[in-house]
Amino acid sequence: MLFRSSIESPVAWARHLVRTRALQQKTGGFTEFVGLPFVHMASPIYLQRKSRRGPTFRETLLVHAVARLAYRGAIDNIQASWVKIGVDGTRQLLQAGCNDVGGTLMNENISRAAGASHGQGMTPESFASLVEPLGRPLRQRTTLYATR
């Protein structure tokens, strides 16, 4: 997981990808990469002027696309956080290297408390309407990526 864009730079993001790839090659311990964008709007660190604004959507898209390339053969699953970037953003990330849209969630409040406005949960039907227009199959999976 890379929670990014509160205080670090793109150079730090790249360094993170390189280091986690090396760690994955040694341990095989990661099942996915989740590039969580910093939601700044109501975040205390942002309101105290101790952080930058959250990333632009372009930065978010590029981090996920570069992660797909950087982790090739090491980490197979790249997850988009729909609760942080919304349905439209998630669709775009699915076209830029992501293959996972995460979970349904129930009463999600961490991102909402920070200012995100993309909802507290999604139904399986909502996920289907998100991925099917892209010609992508919707699959239920376990935490370790076994499909059901």
Which residues make up each language-model segment?
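Auxiliary Fe-S-binding modules of radical SAM enzymes
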Residues: 24-148
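Aromatic-lined glycan-binding groove of carbohydrate-active enzymes
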Residues: 13, 22-24
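Aromatic/hydrophobic pocket-lining residues that form the small-molecule binding cavity
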Residues: 13-16, 60
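Canonical radical SAM enzyme core domain
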Residues: 5-13
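Glycine-rich anion-binding loops and their surrounding alpha/beta cores
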Residues: 19
